């Protein structure tokens, strides 16, 4: 089964789940028991649920240095749509000091709100960088978890039947209204090894960071921090055979901006 066909099935599944959730929502129509004096559906102003909005966020545009070399990393996303239905584009990757692009990931997703704080997402993912390209169907959820953690959990299936999963979580700790400390972690898993992309089955890699940003404006914030990147299990073994680092800690500097 191709990744495109699998993605189509995923999108249809999301639509069915979202439709069922909408059908189960309590009706907002007026009733005979409505208290006198409250506005009715005839007198209430029109709801803006169908207004189209757009948002672009570069969460990380940063350099990472170990004192000898500097790598550059990007992590951004954009969406366009209504309060309930959106089209998302997500992209991340790193430009290494030797000129190679690593860990490139781009996703195109349909997003449907299912609760106040969480959305279902489904679509396609392409791994495009200096290594062989891989395509996946994607299905997951994104939102604000209890204790105000931003959470993304996504599963993937390739046309060859390989499975993968990615979990990302972050938290904004306000020191002042403009000074914000953000811990973040991303974890990747794979069901089978892929020698072409040098990833092994099981827990593959972890990227974690602690960044302190200062919001000069709400739309522009420089930051400093520290980041850890590590490879584990079979992925770590593949890295050693290729004479690559299996983990390091680097100082980071960059900007966070949105529009």
Regions from the language model: what does each represent?
Residues 80-82, 112, 143, 157, ...:
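Residue-level signature of outer-membrane beta-barrel architecture
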Residues 60, 89-93, 122-126, 153-157, ...:
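Transmembrane beta-barrel strands of outer-membrane/channel proteins
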Residues 22-100, 104, 111-112:
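Outer-membrane beta-barrel initiation region
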Residues 133-195:
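Detector for outer-membrane/organellar transmembrane beta-barrel domains
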Residues 84-89, 116-120, 147-151, 176-181, ...:
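Repeated loop/turn-to-beta-strand initiation elements of outer-membrane beta-barrel proteins
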Residues 54-56, 72-76, 104-108, 135-139, ...:
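Hydrophobic, lipid-facing positions within transmembrane beta-strands of outer-membrane proteins
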Residues 210-215, 245-259:
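Outer-membrane beta-barrel "beta-signal"
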Residues 64-72, 94-104, 126-136, 156-165, ...:
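Solvent-exposed loop/turn segments connecting transmembrane beta-strands
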């Amino acid at each position: 089964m191709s990744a495109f066909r699998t993605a189509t099935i995923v999108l249809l599944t999301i639509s069915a789940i979202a439709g069922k959730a909408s059908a189960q929502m309590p009706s907002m129509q007026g009733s005979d028991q409505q208290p006198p004096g409250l506005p009715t559906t005839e007198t209430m102003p029109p709801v803006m649920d169908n207004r189209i909005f757009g948002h672009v966020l570069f969460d990380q545009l940063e350099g990472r240095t170990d004192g000898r070399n500097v790598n550059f990393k990007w992590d951004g996303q954009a969406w366009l749509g209504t309060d309930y239905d959106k089209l998302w584009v997500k992209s991340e990757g790193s430009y290494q000091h030797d000129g190679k692009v690593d860990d490139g990931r781009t996703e195109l997703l349909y997003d449907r709100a299912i609760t106040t704080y969480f959305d279902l997402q489904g679509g396609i993912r392409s791994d495009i960088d200096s290594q062989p390209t891989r395509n996946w169907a994607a299905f997951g959820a994104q939102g604000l978890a209890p204790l105000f953690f931003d959470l993304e959990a996504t599963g993937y299936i390739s046309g060859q039947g390989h499975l993968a999963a990615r979990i990302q979580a972050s938290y904004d700790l306000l020191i002042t209204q403009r000074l914000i400390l953000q811990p973040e972690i991303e974890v990747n898993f794979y069901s089978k090894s892929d020698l072409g992309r040098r990833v092994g089955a099981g827990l593959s890699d972890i990227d974690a960071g602690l960044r302190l940003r200062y919001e000069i404006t709400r739309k522009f914030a420089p930051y400093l921090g520290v980041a850890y990147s590590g490879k584990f299990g079979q992925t770590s073994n593949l890295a050693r055979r290729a004479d690559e680092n299996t983990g390091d800690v680097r100082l980071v500097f960059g900007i966070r901006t949105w529009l």
